[in-house]
Curated annotation (Swiss-Prot):
The gene is SMG6. It is found in: Nucleus, Nucleolus; Chromosome, Telomere; Cytoplasm, Cytosol. SUPFAM superfamilies: PIN domain-like, TPR-like. Residues 133-153 are annotated as: EJC-binding motif 2. It comes from Pongo abelii (Sumatran orangutan). This is Telomerase-binding protein EST1A. The PINc domain confers endonuclease activity and is expected to bind the catalytic metal ion. Residues 279-294 have a biased composition (Basic residues). Its EC number is 3.1.-.-.
Length: 1419
């Protein structure tokens, strides 16, 4: 406070100069009013706050000067100062002030003790008596306003420049004493001598007045960094502050009482006016209320600002300067210096008046002088913390609002004390209204009269200004947390209130965002208790905690130029906008919580329905406002989905639940409510779509083209707006779908239209495809459902729940396919004679056991064990050919989905070749029909599903480009096979088109080329699918080059893909695609050509890598023919690309294209190689038998050998006898059980499990079985390990060395055979662990069998049992007389008697290899 009050010190010369300058202008009271009216207030702003400028006239630490030697020198100085101020218009005093400021900065930190010493000067007894006499005369509280803390002047320590300072202070004091003696005449003198505003501010006193305004309310005892550097022991305890609470207003413990009314809102005179008892009582009162602060009331000090309305204008400037001077002197002398000075010397009364307008406006010269003074300041710290002028400036706003003086203020006559004098709203008393006014509430503010203190002006007793407007007494709460801003009204920016809880509904919730930007557009409090830097570039940051930020020019005058860059301003405004958006979302969350609680009830009353409608309306308004304010923020916060879920989805589901509830009283009323809600939603989203287009300036018609990649980049806001528009369209489709379900209808055309529009806006989003799949499921179109679910998974942002939906679809398809297969078998078995004939040939009894019956069914025909494959094929072909196109199409779709279900689920892949063969046969027959029953769109869906199967089955963690999984190769083989059949059909149709063109008379001129316009309709239907698959092949060459292993298909179905493509390329070269010219670059008369298949498959991930070059055609050209020309051009480029591969697949030789692709391992070559291997094995068998006979003859000579052989014979005989007894017991048990129930085994051999002896003795036979491609050879891992052990050789007896070498060689050949086949990834060969895990490679074939029960034979048998999945519900008959029927697809191939017996006990079919070869008719 002392720092602020020191600014109002006015020298005598300055005051004399003011009086001399304004003497000619002295006039009547009306002239003063006219002068005041010339400065009107703008927007009800208070002009008394405008004067503040941070960082000016810090004149606290002036150098001290010696006292003048005599009164003559003092008088001469007064005259000189008066002349200077009158002639030079205040220029020199400003230079002196700058000089003093430079000296102050050079002297270092500010010393409060020095300040007191600087302002102390001797006073005479007469002056003291006159001061006391004046105080007694002006004792009434309505005339005097007391400011607390009047200082006692002290003699400070030594200072080099003290003489000059004290000389000025003595002059001011002498002037003040003279004015006290003629109190009654001063008022008139001030009216006459009212100075001009500009001339006042040109003088040094005017500068100090402005400095005092900037420093008002600042207490010298505040515990801050600049006070800590003062080590002067004379300062004492009152000058240092240890507290950091912002609400604790500490006062001088030696503060004296006043002779004025105790109820006044300001303090009394200094220590010289009272005795020690009064001082102690005031100290006690301060201790009792240490935290009372910033009280706002209509008491004496609060009325200062309002009183200025009715007071004479001429009194304002003089009175204002005098009051500031008096308050500065009273405050600057507080502390220890009060005790050291002569307390009875300072008893004069300073009368200071305030001009509400003059205080807030500056003349240009004053502003320039202020700028000069700012420039004259060196960048040195003015505080102990070493802060510069910026820090000091940022501190001034805080100092301004805590003014509390201790002098006596003589209010002029006719002073209006109403709270709305400045035209401010009623909230104005809550903020800092006066320079030393309402913000300076001390402990005495709660004296007699409280906050509604009445003030009377003796000169105008009829007027009672204090009763004009009164504010309610404040309710004080916690004073420690005072960082909340408050509102000032509409006409001014928000300023910090004196107390946080005055007009705040929720004072504890004012969040502040970290960073350079302010939380709100108005200034507030800084929560820190230590000095901080500026918070933004517009307003200087608060320096002290709990103090309001700058008032004055930042409220009432135009804002100064911002130092923030445009980017920072934009970010600042964006932060503010996001805060508003977060607030809206918080409000919406609250509303949604109420709505959810309402919907959670079992029954909803009519009042609840009305409340629900109200909450929904508020939610829609809040969410719509968020979307239209900041579309990017809304997308990040997912406001679109939250809007749909909270305002529509949960309400719709509640109504649907109530409609289905049988206990609901009036379901029709609920249904009508539901339909009204759906209509409301449709209208809302239609409106939102229009508002999005208007707000973000785009048209939806320009973007519903289905392009995933655009030539020109979109604006950021348009991109987000398109995403929001797509979600709105999806919501429209959902509403249309719910409407159909509510009406119990199934016309989903409108919903499908909305979903397709949404897909065209952003094709990479998977949500529209998922919704389209739902519609396909509702309408039982399984192919469409699978297609859209796959599109949903193969999108840039996939819908992962589609995977579960696909799993359920494929499971249902599998059941239907099995039912269809069973139905076909029943149709084949209509003839009972053939069935009995075939049945008798397949029955075989096991020994003499009549209770066990095995029915062996050959895989070539379901009715007979004998039959040819050709007969089966011709019969099935005749059956497919006899079907209608629609029935054939249904059967094909079912088979196609069944095959892809195996590829997707990877279950039942052992039957995939058979299912794929069926798919290809039906597809081939379908293509023969004209017109094609599939259609262009359905054909595109088939190709898309094939692409997805290859894409979905690729290895995720494989970094090698040549690495492909078995599932991926099978999926690629199926796709290429269907593509080859499609290309064959196109080649045939192209030839037909060429023949038709030759027969056409108008095309005889050009017989060599085939015109695109002459294409037959079936060819036009197929070309888009061929083009799309070729695009995929160009984008992913690693999936088909080198070519994958082809499926094992019959010769009439298996087609060489690359030979077919070569033939297609030869016929395609004859097509003239230049019938419609195509252009690469755009032009004014050209238009972009978009193919229908490209638009339909836009956003499909497997096709994103395909080349997508734009193509332009003339606007007048035929778009249909132009599209076919583009397709032909793309196909020609694709076929040329096959010739340009690193390993070319096509080549141009002898004037035509031929296939140069490496031929896969065909069945013929394998047959030849395996036949040669079989002959070699037979020759080796003969040699082995001869070698065994020779070895026996050689070993029969010795007697020891004979005895050993006899002993072995006896041991074997005993062992055989034991086994026979065991077998008899087993047979007896079986007979006992078989008397009650007969068992039938239906054996359809598919999996063949050989043991180790089978590879040693019958390797060639196993190779023939493998080459037949009818069976899958399953090799247990334990058999491979045994073969490895035999191949290494373990000779323990030299006499058996020859046979061991033979066995070792056969085992080695078996291992080589298996490794070769596994390396080539033979689909009919697989390895199986003892736990039932299939292996695609035997590179790692060691198995840990610890914990496995039994020997190796048991492990082999466990592999067979892996394929025997018996379920009681499947084989147990309904009646006791019927036999138990078991289905077996596995056969154990072994000669081991023990293993065969174990297999029979477990109902596992078993045969030796030669017998099975005879039955299977292989070899």
């Amino acid at each position: 406070m002392a720092e602020g009050l020191e600014r109002v010190r006015i020298s005598a010369s300055e005051l004399r100069g003011i009086l001399a300058t304004l003497a000619p202008q002295a006039g009547s009271r009306e002239n003063m009013k006219e002068l005041k009216e010339a400065r009107p207030r703008k927007d009800n702003r208070r002009p008394d706050l405008e004067i503040y400028k941070p960082g000016l006239s810090r004149l606290r630490n002036k150098p001290k000067i010696k006292e003048p030697s005599g009164s003559e020198e003092f008088k001469d100085e007064i005259v000189n100062d008066r002349d200077c101020s009158a002639v030079e218009n205040g220029t020199q005093p400003f230079k002196d002030v700058c000089k003093e400021l430079n000296n102050q900065q050079q002297n270092g930190p500010i010393d409060p003790e020095n300040n007191r010493g600087q302002e102390s000067f001797p006073r005479t007894a007469g002056q003291e008596d006159r001061s006391l006499k004046m105080i007694k005369r002006t004792k009434k509280p309505d005339l005097q306003i007391y400011q607390p803390g009047r200082r006692l002047q002290t003699v400070s320590k030594e200072s080099a420049s003290r003489v000059e300072e004290e000389e000025i202070l003595n002059q001011v004091e002498q002037l003040r004493v003279e004015e006290d003696e003629c109190r009654g005449n001063v008022v008139k003198e001030e009216v006459v001598n009212k100075p001009d505003r500009a001339e006042i501010e040109k003088s040094p006193g005017g500068d100090r007045v402005r400095a005092a305004k900037g420093e008002k309310g600042k207490r010298i005892e505040k515990g801050e960094g600049m006070r800590k550097t003062n080590d002067d022991p004379a300062q004492g305890k009152p000058g240092s502050a240890k507290r950091y609470s912002r609400s604790d207003k500490r006062r001088n413990r030696y503060r004296t009482c006043s002779t004025s009314s105790a109820g006044s809102n300001n303090s009394a005179e200094g220590a010289g006016l009272t005795d020690n008892g009064c001082r102690r009582r005031r100290q006690d009162r301060t201790k009792e209320r240490p935290r009372l602060k910033k009280q706002v009331s209509v008491s004496s000090t609060d009325s200062l600002d309002e009183d200025r309305i009715d007071e004479p204008d001429g009194l304002e400037p003089r009175r204002s300067s005098e009051r500031k001077k008096h308050l500065e002197r009273n405050w600057s002398g507080r502390g220890e210096g009060e005790q050291k000075s002569n307390g009875k010397e300072n008893r004069g009364t300073l009368r200071v008046t305030f001009d509400a307008e003059a205080m807030n406006k500056e003349s240009p010269m004053v502003r320039s002088a202020r700028d000069d003074m700012d420039r004259g300041k060196p960048d040195k710290g003015l505080s102990s913390g070493g802060k510069g002028s910026e820090k000091q400036e940022s501190k001034n706003p805080k100092q301004e609002l805590r003014g509390r003086g201790r002098g006596i203020l003589i209010l002029p006559a006719h002073t209006t004390l109403s709270v709305n004098s400045a035209g401010s709203p009623e909230s104005a008393p809550l903020g800092p209204r006066l320079l030393f006014g309402s913000g300076s509430k001390g402990p005495r503010s709660w004296g007699r009269g409280g906050t509604t203190r009445r003030l009377w002006d003796p000169n105008n007793p009829d007027q009672k200004p204090a009763l004009k407007t009164q504010t309610p007494q404040l309710h004080f709460l916690d004073t420690d947390d005072e960082v909340s801003p408050t509102s000032w009204g509409d006409s001014r920016q928000a300023q910090a209130s004196y107390y946080k809880f005055q007009n705040s509904d929720n004072p504890y919730y004012y969040p502040r965002t970290p960073g350079p930007a302010s939380q709100y557009p108005y200034t507030g409090y800084n929560p820190l208790q230590y000095p901080v830097g500026p918070t933004n570039g517009v307003y200087p940051g608060p320096y002290y905690p709990g103090y309001p930020t700058p008032s004055g020019p930042y409220v009432c005058s135009p804002l100064p130029a911002s130092t923030m860059s445009p980017e920072e301003v934009e970010q600042h405004m964006r932060n503010l906008q996001q805060q508003e958006l977060h607030r809206l979302l918080r409000v919406a969350d609250n509303q949604e919580l109420q709505l959810s609680n309402l919907l959670s009830r079992d029954r909803i009353s009519p009042e609840g329905l009305e409340k629900m409608a109200q909450l929904r309306a508020e939610l829609l308004q809040l969410y719509e406002r968020c979307i239209l304010l900041d579309i990017e923020f809304s997308d990040n916060q997912n406001v679109d989905q939250i809007l749909w879920k909270n305002a529509f989805y949960q309400v719709i589901e509640k109504f649907r639940q109530l409609v289905k509830d049988p206990n609901v009283e009036n379901p029709e009323q609920i249904r009508n409510r539901l339909l009204e809600l759906l209509d409301e939603g449709s209208d809302f989203f239609d409106s939102l779509l229009q508002k999005l287009q208007v707000t973000y300036k785009f048209k939806l018609e320009d973007y519903i083209d289905g392009l995933a990649i655009r030539s020109k980049p979109l604006r950021k806001t348009v991109k987000y707006a398109l995403i929001s528009a797509q979600r709105c369209m999806i919501c429209q489709g959902d509403i249309a779908r719910y409407r159909e379900q509510a009406r119990d209808t199934a016309n989903y055309g409108k919903a499908r239209s909305w979903y397709l529009k949404a897909q065209h806006i952003a094709p990479k989003n998977g949500r529209p495809y998922n919704q389209l799949a739902l519609l396909a499921v509702y309408t039982r179109r399984k192919l469409d459902a699978v297609y859209y679910y796959m599109r949903s998974l193969a999108a840039s942002n996939p819908i992962l729940t589609a995977k579960e939906s696909l799993m359920s679809l494929f499971e249902e398809t599998k059941r239907k396919a099995e039912q269809m297969e069973k139905k076909q078998h029943e149709e084949f078995e209509l003839s009972p004679d053939q069935w009995r004939k075939g049945k008798k040939s397949t029955f075989r009894h096991v020994g003499d056991d009549t209770t066990r019956l095995e029915i062996w069914i050959h895989p070539s025909h379901p009715r007979s064990s004998q039959g040819t494959e050709s007969g089966k094929d011709s019969e099935q072909e005749n059956g497919l050919g006899s079907l209608s196109p629609s029935d054939l199409n249904k059967r094909f779709i079912l088979s196609f989905l069944h095959a892809h279900g195996k590829l997707f689920t990877r279950i039942g892949m052992e039957t995939f070749p058979a299912v794929a063969e069926k798919v290809l046969k039906e597809f081939q027959v379908l293509l023969q029909h004209s017109p094609s029953p599939i259609g262009s769109t359905r054909m595109l869906q088939l190709m898309t599903i094939n692409m997805f199967a290859v894409h979905n089955s690729q290895l995720k963690d494989c970094f090698s480009e040549e690495c492909r999984s078995v599932i991926q190769e099978q999926a690629a083989a199926l796709g290429l096979a269907m593509f080859s059949l499609l290309v064959c059909r196109c080649t045939y149709l192209l030839k037909e088109s060429a023949k038709a063109q030759l027969s056409s008379p108008e095309d005889q001129d050009d017989q060599d080329d085939i015109k695109v316009s002459s294409f037959v309709p079936d060819l036009k239907e197929l070309l888009p699918s061929v083009k799309v698959w070729s695009d995929w092949m160009l984008g992913y060459p690693d999936t088909w080059n080198p070519p994958p292993t082809s499926l094992d298909l019959p010769s009439h179905v298996a087609v060489d893909v690359w030979s077919t493509l070569a033939d297609f390329c030869n016929i395609l070269t004859a097509v003239n695609q230049s019938e419609v010219p195509l252009y690469k670059d755009p032009d004014d008369d050209l238009t972009l050509l978009i193919l229908e298949e490209d638009r339909l498959l836009s956003g499909f991930v497997p096709l994103l890598a395909a080349p997508q070059d734009p193509c332009y055609v003339e606007k007048t050209s035929d778009k249909v023919i132009a599209a076919d020309c583009k397709r032909v051009t793309v196909l020609k480029y694709f076929l040329e690309a096959l010739c340009g591969q690193e390993e070319p697949l096509l080549a141009f030789k002898d004037g035509k294209y031929v296939s140069v692709a490496p031929a896969p391992d065909t069945m013929g070559k394998e047959m030849v190689s395996q036949e040669g291997t079989r002959l070699e094995d037979e020759e080796e068998d003969v040699v082995i038998e001869d070698f065994e006979e020779d070895s026996e003859a050689e070993g029969s000579g010795g007697e020891d050998d004979i005895r050993e052989l006899r002993a072995k014979k006896l041991a074997l005989a005993r062992k055989i006898a034991e086994q026979q007894r065991r077998q008899e017991k087993i047979q007896a048990v079986l007979e006992d059980h078989s008397q009650m129930r007969q068992m039938e085994l239906e054996i359809r051999p598919l999996f063949l499990v050989p043991d180790t002896n089978g590879f040693i003795d019958h390797l060639a036979s196993l190779a023939r079985l493998l080459e037949s491609r009818k069976y899958i050879l399953v090799v247990p891992l334990i058999v491979i390990n045994e073969l490895d052990g035999l191949a290494k050789g373990q000779e323990t007896d030299h006499r058996a060395g020859g046979y061991a070498r033979v066995v070792q060689e056969k085992a080695r050949k078996s291992i080589e055979f298996l490794e070769q086949r596994f390396e080539s990834r033979d689909s009919c060969l697989r390895a199986l662990t003892s736990r039932g895990n299939e292996l695609e490679s035997i590179a790692f074939r060691s198995e840990d069998i610890t914990g496995q029960l039994g020997n190796n034979d048991d492990l082999i048998l466990s592999c067979c049992l892996h394929y025997c999945k018996d379920k009681a519900k499947d084989f147990m008959p309904t009646s006791k007389e019927e036999p138990i029927r078991l289905l077996r697809e596995v056969v154990l191939l072994t000669d081991d008697r023990n293993l065969r017996v174990k297999a029979l006990t477990r109902n596992v079919p078993v045969r030796d290899i030669p017998a099975f070869l005879t039955w299977a008719q292989v070899g």
